[in-house]
């Protein structure tokens, strides 16, 4: 018997997640993501027009050339959820493998959009929808199970590969939200059942391992937004809320609050249109009937003209640009590149924390500084993370009781912090906790 886990991407950084599991020559790929901060560094780059080798060189997508040295055949590409750091490299890499792409309904719809926008490669891999709670035989020896989990995007799952040698559980990304705004609670029964049946290896995200306690549920963010928006004296002023375009639950909360305020909710931005439009089309979420969505620049321009003409106080704008990204709607508004001109006491609510890297921090600081100079009231803190904190990770380890652990989706500070937690639970670095670099392979050999 030979089972290998190949760390292709996401084992030295946050992002560009990609892992391969080789079971006696039958290979399953888990996720194909991009590294978002590298996209920002190369801000003039249109990824859709570039060759995969250029993107590998820039550190934007995983370097899957390591797969040339792996003996076996790829049988499936399995996606855990729809964030770009997990699916963004599909248009660049999937065509190399004669294998279907498997994901939940929302994830597959997002992948379809990514493939349609690709200008360099012709991606023809079959797309297979698998719902949370369902299983599918990938080969006679490997069964894939999707366990429902919560994260900051709907339809997220824990993919589990059931093999003759034990299960491989892929925990990128998750939180335990017992009060979700959209969707259901995690399937704790299924998680514990997998643990009882025997987990050979658990691959776990580490993004928020350095935060004590447990990550609060999404309903807390909803309450904070109500506090900011309903309690403030802003009846006569413009209100703009900015958050992650993929955070459908958060956007649902904001649009519902707009309705309570008697304001028409307006979504602005291409990514807002993509993520929210798909979620609404497939029935994942029900937004207020008067919701308006504008994606392309000309329609956004026209929408803002109408808002100014009819009165800012009649609308609540939900815009892209919470990280201060140049070219995002909020950044363009703050630099007077749209018909919407900020006035004193207009409100901007940031319902997202800055992504922790220097470039994001600098861009966000510049945006906030510009808004303050214009007399804008700024509200921050109406946010909860979509990632597990330390005690969530401890619970997961106790339920799964894996023989081996591979920390991932983080730099070495984060994976080392996860190792400390694992050692508190009786594991030992180098024995059953394994810190891998991108391109490295961990082999398990045993007799059944």
Curated annotation (Swiss-Prot):
InterPro entries assigned: Metallo-B-lactamas, RibonucZ/Hydroxyglut_hydro, RMMBL, RNase_J, RNase_J_2, RNase_J_arc, RNase_J_b_CASP, RNase_J_CS
EC numbers for this chain: 3.1.-.-
Keyword Zinc applies: yes
Transmembrane segments: none
Subcellular location per the Swiss-Prot or TrEMBL entry: Cytoplasm
Gene Ontology MF terms: 5'-3' RNA exonuclease activity; RNA binding; RNA exonuclease activity; single-stranded DNA 5'-3' DNA exonuclease activity; zinc ion binding
Cofactor(s), names only, from the UniProt record: Zn(2+)
Native organism taxonomy: Archaea, Methanobacteriati, Methanobacteriota, Methanomada group, Methanococci
Top-level taxon: Archaea
Residues binding Zn(2+) 1, per UniProt: 81, 83, 151, 173
The keyword RNA-binding is annotated on this UniProt entry: yes
Subunit description: Forms homodimers on heating to 60 degrees Celsius which may be the active form.
Temperature dependence (free text): Optimum temperature is 60 degrees Celsius for nuclease activity on RNA.
Keywords noted in UniProt: Cytoplasm, Exonuclease, Hydrolase, Metal-binding, Nuclease, RNA-binding, Zinc
Single Gene Ontology BP annotation: RNA catabolic process
Chief place of localization: cytoplasm
Stated name of the protein: Ribonuclease J
Protein residues bound to substrate: 383-387
């Amino acid at each position: 018997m030979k089972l290998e886990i190949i760390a292709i991407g996401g084992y030295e950084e946050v992002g560009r997640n990609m892992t391969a599991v080789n079971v006696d020559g039958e290979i399953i790929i888990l996720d194909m993501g991009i590294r978002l901060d590298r996209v920002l560094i190369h801000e003039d780059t249109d990824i859709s027009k570039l060759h995969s080798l250029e993107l590998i060189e820039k550190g934007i997508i995983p370097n899957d050339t390591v797969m040339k040295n792996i003996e076996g055949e790829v049988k499936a590409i399995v996606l855990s959820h729809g964030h770009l750091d997990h699916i963004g490299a599909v248009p660049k890499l999937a065509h190399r493998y004669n294998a279907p792409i498997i994901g939940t309904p929302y994830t597959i719809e997002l992948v379809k959009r990514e493939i349609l926008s690709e200008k360099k490669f012709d991606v023809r891999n079959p797309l297979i929808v698998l719902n949370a709670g369902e299983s599918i035989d990938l080969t006679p020896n490997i069964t894939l199970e999707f366990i429902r989990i919560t994260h900051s995007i709907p339809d997220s799952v824990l993919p589990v590969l059931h093999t003759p040698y034990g299960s491989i559980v892929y925990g990128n990304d998750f939180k335990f939200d017992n009060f979700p705004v959209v969707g259901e609670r995690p399937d704790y029964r299924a998680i514990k059942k997998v643990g009882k049946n025997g987990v050979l290896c658990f691959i776990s995200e580490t993004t928020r391992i350095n935060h004590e306690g447990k990550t609060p549920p999404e309903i807390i963010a909803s309450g904070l937004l109500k506090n900011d928006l309903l309690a403030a004296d802003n009846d006569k002023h413009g209100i703009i809320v900015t958050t992650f375009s993929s955070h459908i639950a958060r956007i649902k909360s904001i649009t519902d609050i707009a309705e309570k305020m008697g304001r028409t909710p307006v979504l602005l931005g291409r990514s807002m249109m993509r993520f929210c439009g798909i979620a609404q089309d497939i029935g994942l979420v029900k937004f207020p009937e008067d919701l308006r969505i504008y994606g392309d620049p000309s329609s956004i321009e026209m929408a803002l003209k109408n808002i100014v003409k009819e009165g800012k106080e009649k609308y609540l704008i939900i815009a892209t640009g919470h990280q201060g990204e140049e070219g995002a709607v909020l950044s363009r508004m703050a630099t007077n590149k749209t018909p919407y001109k900020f006035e004193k006491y207009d409100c901007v609510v940031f319902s997202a924390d800055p992504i922790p890297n220097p470039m994001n921090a600098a861009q966000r600081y510049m945006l906030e500084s510009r808004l303050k100079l214009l007399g804008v009231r700024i509200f921050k803190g109406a946010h909860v993370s979509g990632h597990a904190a330390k005690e969530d990770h401890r619970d997961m380890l106790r339920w799964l009781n894996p023989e081996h652990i591979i920390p991932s989706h983080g730099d070495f500070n984060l994976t080392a912090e996860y190792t400390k937690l694992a050692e508190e639970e009786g594991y030992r670095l180098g024995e059953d906790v394994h810190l891998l670099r991108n391109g490295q392979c961990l082999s398990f050999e045993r007799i059944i």
